[in-house]
Structure formats: structure tokens, C-alpha cells
């Protein structure tokens, strides 16, 4: 007899296949506006600016993309975990250390979930945090410069997916193990996963200036910890993590990890965890992980850390509780009041809504249904506030509009479902094109949603854009939510694979944007603050070029006396003190990238010449009518040559020094 679960899966797969097949036909724009009306609502006139910044993860690009809403225009890409040749990020000597890990230099990661820092549960626009999923890391971006300021590696973890969700006053960002592994690592059979694998929940402290430090970790059963959100209001001091694969399968998880009707939300009382750490109940355990940050000289530095504090739920009681949740839950989303915790069960037929107040009552009355590794399992009926019936096939994530409604992304049936927090009934639904993953409402995960729009982050586009070979772009779709019914306004392509996004009013940060770096405050030891200071210095086989750039020349721009086998360091300082006048630098044969140097900034490129000859360098970033003339030459002589090291001073020919 066929198991009912398999019937559900077969039906879901059939619907999914039908949805993809429908992609070959021109879809009916159900819920959309007439083209002229939609265009008017997203049109931003020349010279005018968007209302919102949207920060979207790049997924496998490893970076963050910045868009404007409602226009959908792409403004910038911010390199985070991946080397980015356009800006020399991860190539210049001042940025390479940001990509250090306990595994060495790792110039890529899988960036999933951006989160804006918060004050009183409301986005404040100071920093943006984002996780690296592959080599477990969390990065912090400075939203005044739109640059990566810090990256911390997370030890004892694998697959940092439930991250870096922020607590209401940015006390912590969190991380969690998606792929449970032996902790500490050791050589054991994969078949002993149940006995030897563990998952860890990590709490990373955020200091007043944003500096991150690993505060403590909580050892958990070897499940897969998927997503998280912190509580707010009455649930402040708690964080909620979804788990799947409570079966602890280790092969063919699409079947093995879907046997049980319910998995869990792990409700973590991080205030209680703090108490246990203060009481000395945590065990300081050897660990190896990198902490990288940009120091006050604007140079990235790296420090290897050697231990972490690990808490055991059996020793720190009343710290963690499991809330049974159907089935393979993905999102763990807390409504603006902090009362409701919504889980999107990827294989569930309902959308469960847990009540924080009921959970507290259940804990007080010990309404337990056993335990898992010493962690109490609360009875489902004791915590559930209600279930949203017929949410669609494959509900994933929920955001909130602040007006009493939740909006849930539904992957298999490709739709957004709007439902009421009062009676848990669906009030509207609208198709997406196609296979929505995350969705985002500006501030929709906070105590004060800004509302107005919901953005669908779609995995598949099929017929939506001009084809681009075997791989098609992924997309975002903008819907208006200021009325009773959702209305499709705009499609726009995205960079990489945006798993999640955050949007905040531009007014929060637009006036705080740094326009240039004050040259007088440049503390880089390789800085050259005037053309008169430009020079070339040999130290053995190293040649250091202390160079300046200003519209429209380099100083020096002719250099002789470099030899094959030398290592040449070009320390370039941009002397400009004006907004949006970066200077680039590239030289023939460099095996790294260009430099892109902001006004008042210093960056260093390493070049190792292997051939005799004369090699040009030039500015790669257009800056003036004489941009083409912004160039120079380096003469490379044979190793051991007697050619003297010479360079030209401003306005002179070479050899005039």
C-alpha cells in the first residue's frame, strides 16, 4: 500500500512540473496592473531617486547587490566573500586579509541572508550583516561606505545557513550548523552520524562600534539547522531556529530526511545562555578560526582565535526547547508584535503559527512530549495558535506588513499568499514567475515594517527575459501591497542567486554616505600624500613604488631599473578630494587584477615581471577628458643588470632626478 506521504510528494511534483511547463506559455498577469499603470508606479524620473535601498544577497556570487525600489535599478555590487577584480577586492594588499580562514585564503563563499542592524527591533541603517554558507563566516558591511568592514569565521560548524539573523538591539547575530559534523572534527565513519555528529548554534556578540566576537555556542543534536529569527517585544531574549532531518539521515536526504510528520523549531533563551556563561557552565574548548577586520589605517588585518565557549543544554537547563513543527520547516519568522512564530514547512499542507505566550505557559506547566538529547519537546497543541489552511504547495518564508497580515512565499505552486494574523485565513494570493524562494517586505521582519511593497525572489525565469544561453537570470518581482489585493508592478533581473534581501528607506542612510576619504586622515604607512613625496625604493629583490594619481596623471609615470624576478609593489594613493573620482591602475602582465582607489585612499598591487621589455600601466576608470593620457611605463631589464633605478619627478623626463 502506498504511503500517504508519497502521495503528497507525487502530487506536489506533478504540480511543480505543470508550473514549469506553463513557463513555455505566455502567462496571464493575474493580479497585475495595466502596463501603463504599473509603469507609472515604478517610474523614477531622471534626476529623481528611489524611495528604498534594497540589499540582496548574491548567493553563489559571494557578494551583495544594491538596488533601488521601486525602480529595480542595480546601483552597485559590494564584494564580500569573493574576490572582485573590478575593484581589486581580495587582490590588493589592503583587502586580502579579509578572506583569511582557518583553511587558509578562501576567496569565495555562498552568501545567503543579509540583515540590517536594528535598534529597538527596527532597522537603523548602521551595518549590514551577511552569512557565508560554505566556509562558515559572517561579514559586516559599513553602510556609510558600502564596503566590507569585518569577517569572522565560525568554528565547530558546517554550512552556516541559519545566519546572521540579528537580535532587536544588535546584541548578537547568530549562526547555526546546516550540515552536522563531528564536533570536534575526527575520523569517524559517516554511517555513525547519529552517534558522532552534532550541530552547534553560535551567538556572535556585536560591539558598540560593530566589532564582532564569538560569545558562546550551544551544542545541539546532529540535525540540520535551517533558518532563524530573533524574538522581539514579549519574545525578546529568545531566538528561533528551524530544524529538518531530525531523522539524522546521512544519504539521499530527499527521502531519508522526510520520514517524520514533524520536525522542530528550536526556541533558544539566549538571556538564559548568558547567565550560564556568567556562572561558568560553558566549557572553553579548543577551536581554530579567523577574525578579520579593517583597522583604523584602512588595512585589513587577520587574527587567528584558538577557543570557544560551548554550552550543553543538559547543564544549562531551561535554555532550549523544541516546538514540533510540520514538515521539513524552512523559515522561522516572528511577527512584528513578537507573539507569533511562523514556520514554513516545505512538505506541509498547513502553515503552523506558534504562540510565544502559549509556549511560555507550556514551559511553566511542563507540557512536554518527551525530550531529544535532554532538550524538552513541547506538545504541539500546547504552543500552536493556529494553522493557515491551504497555503499552497511548498510554503517557505513569511514577512509582515505591520497591518495584521503575513505574506508567505510558496515554492512549488509559485505564489505569494496573504493571510490574516487574526483568524489565520488566506485573504489573497498572486502568482510569481517562477518558483519563488524568499520574499521581502521593507522592514517586514522587524517590529516596524515599512510596508508598501513585497518583493518575490524567484529561482526560475523561463520565458520572462531574452535568453542568455544555457543559464538564465534569476529575478525579483515587485508587488504593491498598499491595498487589499496584491498587484504586480515590475520584473527585474538579479545578480547571482538572491536568497534573501533587506530594504530600508533611503532616508535612513542617504545623508550618511561617505563621499571621499580625507587625505589628511590617511594612516596607511604606504600612503604618498603629495606628488613631491613620490619615489621608488629598492629593498633587495623588492621594489616599492610610492605613487600618486590625480586628474590626469600618475607620479611617477616612468620607471627604469626594475629587473626580471623582482617583486614590485605599486602603492597608489588617490590625491583627489572630490566625490566619485576613483582612479584605476593596471599594468601589463599582472596576474591578479586592477586597483580601484577611492579619493584619499591608498591601495597596493603586486606585480612580478618575468620578461625583459617596456610595460605600460594606465588608469582604468574614466576621470577626465584626458583619461586616455593617464598612463606610464616600467622598463624591465635582465636580472643582474646594472641599469640604475630611476624615475621621473612631476613634469620632468626620466633621469632628471
Where are these regions (language model features)?
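Extracytoplasmic/periplasmic copper-protein system
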Residues: 515-548, 624-657
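N-terminal edge beta-strand
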Residues: 537-567
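Asp-box/WD-like beta-propeller blade repeats and closely related beta-sheet repeat scaffolds
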Residues: 144-264, 271-273, 280-296, 300-324, ...
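Conserved beta-strand positions in repeat-built beta-propeller and related beta-rich domains
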Residues: 56-59, 122-123, 128-134, 173-185, ...
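Short loop/turn segments immediately following beta-strands, especially the blade-tip
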Residues: 69-73, 143-147, 203-212, 267-289, ...
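Short, conserved, GDST-rich strand-edge loop motifs in beta-rich repeat architectures
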Residues: 40-52, 113-116, 125, 175-197, ...
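Surface loop/turn motifs at the tips and blade-to-blade linkers of beta-strand repeat domains
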Residues: 78-81, 110, 152-157, 216-223, ...
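Repeated scaffold domains used in trafficking and secretory/extracellular systems
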Residues: 41-43, 86-92, 108-120, 156-166, ...
